[in-house]
């Protein structure tokens, strides 16, 4: 029963993600609170390093973010490490966030073949899913078009996605800044092609779209990587 939604809640959940996020940012500012129950954080805060500790820590962070942040982002692996108990803990935390009306992003960085990623829509975007979230993060390195199905499912359910384009980890630069040798964006960086694909999904939207990017602004000497 934990995942049940009223008709009013379901109507609100189906509204456009980009619009809801934009409205939340206008009300609370641009802050998105990352909820990442690392082992050391749990220890420092006096919680057990287990699924219950991760849940209690996350609930405390939710209470602090409520009414102060535009959204919260959960690091999926920090719950997955505890197996089924950790997933159940994340389900309860997501439910609590929905009850508070906080926009939720699950940072799962999923990706794969279209037949694989289509399952993610059932996990995160269906109205009665226990892991229902407002948005998830995706990896596009099977080809950005491999994500078309899950993106369309997200949009059809009023959800959003964040696609990794230009990330902060230095190890990613060799791939993300590589120059495409063929295809629609030949001569451009991989990051540019990903961003352009996302833009196509948002075409025609007024204001913020629902297909977003994970993008770290490059230093002045590295600005060419996004071109």
Set out the residue ranges of the language-model regions.
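N-terminal active-site wall of soluble small-molecule enzyme domains
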Residues: 76-129
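Conserved N-terminal beta1-alpha1 strand-loop-helix module at the mouth
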Residues: 9-74, 85-89
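Acidic (Asp/Glu)-rich catalytic clusters
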Residues: 62-68, 99, 151-156
